[in-house]
Every structure is written in C-alpha cells, then in structure tokens.
C-alpha cells in the first residue's frame, strides 16, 4: 500500500464516525482500530492528533511509516 492509498483509506474511513467528533479524534480512532499503531504514534513518537487537529497530517505520515 502506498502512502497515498493509506491516507485515502484513513480519510474515507473516518466518514463513518460520529459528526460531533473532531477530525483528529476520528483519524486517531480509525488508525487505532484498523492498523493498531495509533498509541505507538502517540506515546513513542509524541504525535497526538486526538487532541490536536493540526497534527493530523504528521500523525498519518508517522502511522504509515510503522506499517
């Protein structure tokens, strides 16, 4: 899977989540449920888009590197 395919999968996948969630929460939870690397990105790499939407791109990039 290329980075572009991964990113597209994540951005399409979050459409099913609750609308009252921030985008970062959706991205975090989707990657956590499907790829199981979200907490590693959060704790080992210090990138946390759950609380900071401005880190979504960096979070997706870091998660992809761990696949």
Question: What does each model-found stretch correspond to?
Answer:
Residues 1-28:
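N-terminal acidic leader/helix
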Residues 18-55:
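Acidic, low-complexity, intrinsically disordered interaction modules
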Residues 51-67:
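Charged low-complexity stretches with an acidic bias
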């Amino acid at each position: 899977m290329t980075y572009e395919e991964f990113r597209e999968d994540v951005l399409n996948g979050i459409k099913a989540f609750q609308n009252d969630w921030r985008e970062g929460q959706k991205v975090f939870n989707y990657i956590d449920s499907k790829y199981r690397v979200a907490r590693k990105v959060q704790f080992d790499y210090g990138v946390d888009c759950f609380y900071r939407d401005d880190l979504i791109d960096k979070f997706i990039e870091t998660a992809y590197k761990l696949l």
